[in-house]
C-alpha cells in the first residue's frame, strides 16, 4: 500500500512549523523522518495519518484521501504515538482484545488475534498481568502489538524508542524488522542517528519543518560527506580552515574541536592533520550526524 503526501504545510498562528513537505512511502518500505527535536517530525507524522489537519496540502493512502475518508483509512493504518496510552485497568491481553473491538473484531476472533500478537511480541507470559508491571520496553512492544491488531498495511511509529535503555531499543528494532518482513510499509520518526541508519530504507532529513535532503542512508553519507572524517581538538580554527580549504573538503566546529571530511585520496590531508600539535586527533566512518551538521549547521542532539 502506497502513501503520498503533496506540499504539506501547517501553521500555528502565523508560524509555519511544516513547510511544503512532499513524500512517497512505497509498499514494503521503511521511510524515516530524521531531525532534531522541534524539526516538525511529529506534526508531519500527525498530518500523514490524519491526526493533524494540514493548513495546506494532500495526503493519499492508496485510493483514499486521509482527511476526507478517515473511516476507510483507519482500517489500513496502524499508529504508535510517543505516548503508550495503555489502559491501566486492563490486563495485557485485555488491552489487545478491547482495542480489537474498535475494528469490529470481537469474540473468539479477537481472542485468537490477541494471543497471536502476544506470541509475536514475546509477551505471552504477561498476558494476565496488568500493564503497570511491564518495563518501558515491554510496554512499547505491547503498544506496537496493539497497533497491528487489525492487520494494517502501513504502520506509523513516532519516536518509538525514546526513553528506552539500549537493550530495549535493540529488541524493538528487531520487532520493526519483523514487521517489514511481513510486508508492511513503515513510516518512522526519530532523532536517533543510529536508529535511522539501521532501520530506514530511505530518509527525509527535516530541519525547521523543511525537507533539506533525502535518500538512502548510505547514499546520503557518501554523497554529502564521503567515507571518513577526522575529529581534531586543541588547534586554532584558522589552521583547520586553511587545511580543509586547500584540500577542497568540508569542515565544521564540533564540540570542543572540529570535524573534517577525509576524501578518498586523503593521505596528504591526514598527514597534515597528524603534524599539528593537537590535543586529540582521530578518524572514523562518516555518519548521519555529519550529514545533518553539514546540511544545517546543527547537530541532531541540538
Stretch-by-stretch model annotation:
Residues 173-263:
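ABC transporter nucleotide-binding domain
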Residues 57-68, 72-73:
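Conserved ABC transporter NBD signature motif
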Residues 130-137:
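Conserved ABC ATPase signature
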Residues 151:
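Conserved catalytic motifs of ABC-family nucleotide-binding domains
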Residues 155-158:
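Catalytic Walker B motif of ABC-type/P-loop ATPase nucleotide-binding domains
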